């Protein structure tokens, strides 16, 4: 029932060639495809295992809630989800919105097909019995993302004449701010949505990195501070 680490080690070979080819046309290299699918699989696999643990060991529910409150329900994450941050049709925007789908502030209209992605993941969680089955759902999500990523743009090297495909307009600069010329960096002029200060944007970037490390197993799910333990006990009672 728990993660199949042998399957995860061979992830690169499990991804069908067509996905590499489609992603290349969008400007993504092979190593980027592996990384993206891995992140999506981590999220789906976490949801699968959470459901398994909640079902078979309900006493752990408060423990898990305490951990997720710490990494997935911080104030800066809540505010960012309500803002216009991470609303470009690029990888950074989609993964931020996807890994925070369970947050009550999640805006399913922030990106194309986000509502469809949520339904795809959560309508299947209860029936997933293995890492491979979770992988197939992650691939289905990646298929949707590829349909929404902008087409890549061919660029020719002036010296060598070599042609490469780079990511098209609408990609993120790494901080979730759109670079597609929409004239709005942080949503301050977009329907009264909350703005993030420069300091909050740095906090947000740090919070997202911690979320990804958490899903990747780099942050121990066993290490709880006394404060976290108290929060867990409060939820359990």
Where are these regions (language model features)?
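Short, functionally important secondary-structure microenvironments
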Residues: 1-237
